């Protein structure tokens, strides 16, 4: 591993996106099935800086989604509304085929997706390895320019239909973070200056 690469945070991350790329599948027996994109290489602003999910071959481990993937509502582990039938990587995006359950809670969300009221999609994922890229520098493969943290190895573990999306490049996509509110960098810079003046 190069000096620029570090073992990433062990905490769980989420990204939400909004797009018109959630599509109902056609044909008999597919009434509750949709295809969607759930992640891309679109830069995403975290409170610590810009994060980019690498979608190169081998960067994304889709094993867990393909084996036991679930469809949630707003990342709520108690709101399982369906299952992931298959997930795949294509054209620097992750896609999935999902199927909604038929219980009462799932039916409400299914109808809202079907009618176009809900268009937001989000992915919950864990990071294995990142490459830190300083401002004006490029990644080792020349693909991305800093400042950014490029997530080189990561694995998604759930897909969510979300109410409030933040990234408009995928869909049903990315959503506004519930836990990590985005604070402008100026706030942190001011706090650093205050701390320097009081020490």
Predicted regions and their residues:
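Terminal short linear interaction segments
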Residues: 180-199
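Signature of dsDNA virion morphogenesis modules
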Residues: 1-184
